[in-house]
Amino acid sequence: MKIFTNQEMKNYSNMRVGGKAKKLIILEPKEEIIDVYNDKENTDIFILGNGTNILFTDEYMDKIFVCTKKLNKIEDLGKNLVKVETGANLKDLTDFMKDKNYTGIESLFGIPGSIGGLVYMNGGAFGTEIFDKIVSIEVFDENHQIREIKKEDLKVAYRKTEIQDKNWLVLSATFKFDNGFDAARVKEIKELRESKHPLDKPSLGSTFKNPEGDFAARLISECGLKGTIIGNAQIAEKHPNFVLNLGNATFKDIIDILTLVKKSVLEKFGIKLEEEIIIVR
């Protein structure tokens, strides 16, 4: 493992916001996680993947950040089973599926997170969720043991999994794919994302979860908040469920945007929006 102190955590978040951290540990291989938790000096541990949905405070964080981005192996187990380590990203998995002529999660193409992060929150897009093709996951559990859990033994819902409640670390996921890679679907999703999502400035993607039967972006738009700027943070014109860093946004700028959105939507629609991003203070 590699250990760093006083790292600028803005370099580990797609939002490019964040103060310094007490310690950053980069795992490789996965078994090193046992040593991390057995070290009594390591308290207040936070697991970090690719940082695509993490907003860090600007202040010093007295935490131990454990980064899994080097755990990125993708292995074909045969019989259409593929084991993917937590730090692998969807681009690499999609390329692997194309090479093997596998199909099943093409609609997720373009989501910038790690597999571990997507599994943790049951990430999804365009009618597909990551758990649709998962048969089992490998976790580091609350007893500091590495174990495999079958999908049917897990509680999974919209942007929610039992993993969050039990604070497990996802180490890998095993998928069962079908045959017949859908290149046309990948192309369609790529074009949809480019047309609907603001990809030219730092952001964390979808900021709020969609309430049941509705869309956060629609609610925010109906509140007249498209394009709203606070400090150096902006509610995107192109997709109002995205918050953009215009260059030098602070943690407070972004929190003030989130507060404004939640207050406005609650007052106009009586709906309490819930963040899809993770905020680390």
Curated annotation (Swiss-Prot):
One of its GO terms (molecular function) is flavin adenine dinucleotide binding. The keyword Cell division applies. SUPFAM superfamilies: FAD-binding/transporter-associated domain-like, Uridine diphospho-N-Acetylenolpyruvylglucosamine reductase, MurB, C-terminal domain. The active site is at R159, S206 (proton donor), E276. The keyword NADP applies. Pathway: Cell wall biogenesis; peptidoglycan biosynthesis. This is UDP-N-acetylenolpyruvoylglucosamine reductase. Cell wall formation. NCBIfam families: murB, PRK13905.1.
